[in-house]
Amino acid sequence: MAGTGLFAEILDGEVYKYYADGEWKTSSSGKSVAIMNPATRKTQYKVQACTQEEVNAVMELAKSAQKSWAKTPLWKRAELLHKAAAILKDNKAPMAESLVKEIAKPAKDSVTEVVRSGDLISYCAEEGVRILGEGKFLLSDSFPGNDRTKYCLTSKIPLGVVLAIPPFNYPVNLAVSKIAPALIAGNSLVLKPPTQGAVSCLHMVHCFHLAGFPKGLISCITGKGSEIGDFLTMHPAVNCISFTGGDTGISISKKAGMIPLQMELGGKDACIVLDDADLDLVASNIIKGGFSYSGQRCTAVKVVLVMESVADELVEKVKAKVAKLTVGPPEENSDITAVVSESSANFIEGLVMDAKEKGATFCQEYKREGNLIWPLLLDNVRPDMRIAWEEPFGPVVPVLRINSVEEGINHCNASNFGLQGCVFTKDINKAILISDAMETGTVQINSAPARGPDHFPFQGLKDSGIGSQGVTNSINLMTKVKTTVINLPTPSYSMG
Ligand SMILES: NC(=O)C1=CN([C@@H]2O[C@H](COP(=O)(O)OP(=O)(O)OC[C@H]3O[C@@H](n4cnc5c(N)ncnc54)[C@H](OP(=O)(O)O)[C@@H]3O)[C@@H](O)[C@H]2O)C=CC1
Ligand SMILES: O=C(O)[C@H](O)COP(=O)(O)O
């Protein structure tokens, strides 16, 4: 059970502690932040509301711990990461349990998230020892006007303190996707978990604690982003911010100083369906892509752009599959569970009502109880409806009928977002041309958008982000290139 056994020390009465200087602590604020269970809409957990002084203390510790961590051999950093991964996987139950309770993720998917996170940490350790163990050697005489008098050696050095801010929907996985690359690269790490998802993150951090990382190297500050977010992101000790979430990321980017930013933000992933597509395959992918975790994925299918000639048939197939989705508690592995908050449910409802007023075809009756919204397919959506452009982050999928492929591409490219997209056709040549024309970070051919596997590059164009994720890209982003040039008194060439 969460907060018991191996994890008992992370709890103080009914409030979870924060983590600093290698210890679990109670905030001097005397205040806590409530975490609501999205399904019951009752307070499930409480976490510390950390103060600015506590943030300052953590940053000082992170700065000094990083100096000695950077001198720790790569293989030792990797060894500790492997240890943390093993502890995490061995103790998946309390983390999965808290994911169910604080973000209403179905029980099976919650376990998958923790296991995937352990695998990500291990992969990162292995990738890190390889790519950070290599550098470059350049010779001066390849540039015009130079003899071979200079040997240039390059290597990758850490940035310093990395601030990691993940979102609610994959709190554990999107936290470790920032923590593991930061640590293997020799950085220290300050984590600000999402409020919904904080308890799962605190358990995950305890796994790193149990693995024996040096004191101060990893910290976890809890509190509402709206209250301590600016103080954290504008803190002078921070040398890199890795953020995943919504528009907040855009304002952080504007306020952050001259530091590397990794921003994975919202998306309006389009699914373009050509008239030669395998419609059974498309229908299954719309269900998986649009309704998994009740549509609360940045990579969810958020608009279907289907050729008019096959639209009726596709809509019928999707409708039949929607009817089979189960709706209910996450504990019972229901396909559709309560969305994360009442404000989120209200926002989704706003999009649905706007589509209703403007004449969209409802393939199912709209139904909502508390934060639980029944899966809904909206046909005949038009560009004047909000749902054609905004991301619901809920179990609602709009279908726009198109008369040409160009119309589909234009709709996709007119979005402010550019995260992922997908195209369904049996003609691979057409698929490649469409993929090249879509202004998104990734295009999936004949499958729904997805971030995983976690070592693939993952990035958004336009308002969907800055930089690229994926294990290798994250390690690279969290390092800087350092060069040393050896100057010879006379040119030297190897002979023979
Ligand atoms: N591209 C991608 O990889 C992904 C994108 N997303 C996007 O994220 C959104 C949903 O996630 P959600 O968690 O609601 O996103 P938010 O942007 O609301 O929150 C993300 C994180 O930022 C924190 N935060 C809030 N305000 C501030 C602030 N002023 N300064 C610093 N941090 C702050 C939050 O903390 P707190 O919870 O305490 O408010 C949370 O940890 C969707 O738009 C979705 O598309 C989601 C997942 C992946
Ligand atoms: O937050 C998200 O939506 C995730 O980054 C998506 O991950 P997935 O595509 O692997 O589910």
Curated annotation (Swiss-Prot):
Membrane-crossing residue ranges in chain numbering: none
Major localization listed first in the record, in broad terms: cytoplasm
Protein localization: Cytoplasm
Catalytic activity field: D-glyceraldehyde 3-phosphate + NADP(+) + H2O = (2R)-3-phosphoglycerate + NADPH + 2 H(+)
Binding residues for NADP(+): 192, 195, 230, 391
Gene3D superfamilies: Aldehyde Dehydrogenase, Chain A, domain 1, Aldehyde Dehydrogenase, Chain A, domain 2
CDD domains documented for this protein: ALDH_F11_NP-GAPDH
Entry binding sites for substrate: 116, 169-170, 297-299, 451
InterPro entries: Ald_DH/histidinol_DH, Ald_DH_C, Ald_DH_CS_CYS, Ald_DH_CS_GLU, Ald_DH_N, Aldehyde_DH_dom, ALDH-related_metabolic_enz
Site, as annotated: Transition state stabilizer: 169
Coiled-coil segments: none
Record-listed E.C. numbers: 1.2.1.9
GO molecular function, one term: glyceraldehyde-3-phosphate dehydrogenase (NADP+) (non-phosphorylating) activity
Keywords: Acetylation, Cytoplasm, NADP, Oxidoreductase, Phosphoprotein
Reported function: Important as a means of generating NADPH for biosynthetic reactions.
Protein name per Swiss-Prot or TrEMBL: NADP-dependent glyceraldehyde-3-phosphate dehydrogenase
Naturally occurring in which organism (per UniProt): Arabidopsis thaliana (Mouse-ear cress)
